[in-house]
Each structure stands twice: as C-alpha cells, then as structure tokens.
Amino acid sequence: MSRIGKNPIPIPDKVNVTLSGLAVTVKGPKGELKRTLPSGVSVNQVDNSIVVAPTSTKRSSRERHGLCRTLVANMVIGVSQGYSKKLEIVGVGSRAQVKGKTLVVSAGYSHPVEVVPPEGITFTVENNTNVTVSGTDKELVGNEAAKIRAIRPPEPYKGKGIKYAGERILRKAGKSGKK
C-alpha cells in the first residue's frame, strides 16, 4: 500500500466535496474544481475526510493510489487556500505589465509578448519585474508559470531572463581570452 495514498485527506470547514463514481467535485471559497480519477482506485468520504484506496492488488492500481490521493488533496487545498507561483524578470529594459487580464512581457524581443490566462488563473505584477501567477488548480498555475518562464529562460552568463523566485541559476565563466 502506498505510504502517501493511505493517509486520509482532511476536509476544511468551508469546503464541500461531492463524489460520484470516479468523478470528484470540490467547492470552496476560492472556487470549484472537477476531476475524473483513473480507474483502479476508489474514493470514499468518511466523516470529515476523504479516503482513497486501490480497488485491486494489481500493479497499475497500486501505482495510481498515491497519485490520486495527492490530486484530490491538491484540489482541496486549491479551493480553500489557492496556489501561487512567483517569477522574477532580470535584465535591463525587461519588464511586465497587466492589461486587462492579459500579461504583456517585454523581454528583449522586437515585440512585446502577450500571455492570455486560461479561466481560473490571474496575473499580478509588482515593480514591473515581479510576476505572480495564482489560481485554484495547482497544475494549471505551474503550467502557466512555465510558459511565462519559457518566453526568455535565464541565460548562464549574466543571469538575464525570467526565473522563478528563489531559483538558483548555474553561472558559467566567460571566455578567458587570448594571452
């Protein structure tokens, strides 16, 4: 049995969980998330917690057990607290701003790059260089942050580009020059 999967998921007071077969719907103060879990697991609500269990002893069921428990736990945390990821833009003339809901990034190209958020994702910008991606779905927040970082990944010589907050860039030495 999975060590992660066997732990029950506590349900906070303001969160409502609806189970119908393998479809899980979680409603909370931050929004609503729906997900259909793969076959091989069963999801049950016991008191104020959710228990995920494998339906058989097959390897595929046991593999999905911990995954499904973590997916449901991330849904519960997402609708109650939400998720956010911070990015930093490093470099002269590189900046970001929000126009409406769209994020406009000037990252050294001849044109500004526009990023349109999917439903449930919001962008906020502080000091023109710090971007925060926030939402209820952990996977979607991470994917959008990765898309923004991919516009101009940090380069190893001067560290210019878009990086996650707290990310360490492995720096390289420049050319040593002819002697």
UniProtKB/Swiss-Prot annotation:
Source superkingdom: Bacteria
Annotated InterPro entries: Ribosomal_uL6-like, Ribosomal_uL6-like_a/b-dom_sf, Ribosomal_uL6_a/b-dom, Ribosomal_uL6_bac-type, Ribosomal_uL6_CS
GO MF terms, alphabetically ordered: rRNA binding; structural constituent of ribosome
Keywords annotated in UniProt: Ribonucleoprotein, Ribosomal protein, RNA-binding, rRNA-binding
One Gene Ontology biological process: cytoplasmic translation
A cellular component annotation (GO) from this entry: cytosolic large ribosomal subunit
Record Gene3D superfamilies: Ribosomal protein L6, alpha-beta domain
Homology family: Belongs to the universal ribosomal protein uL6 family.
Cited HAMAP family: Ribosomal_uL6_B (MF_01365_B)
Function per UniProt: This protein binds to the 23S rRNA, and is important in its secondary structure. It is located near the subunit interface in the base of the L7/L12 stalk, and near the tRNA binding site of the peptidyltransferase center.
PANTHER family: 60S/50S RIBOSOMAL PROTEIN L6/L9, LARGE RIBOSOMAL SUBUNIT PROTEIN UL6M
Subunit structure, interactors included: Part of the 50S ribosomal subunit.
Protein name (record): Large ribosomal subunit protein uL6
Organism of this sequence: Synechococcus sp. (strain CC9311)
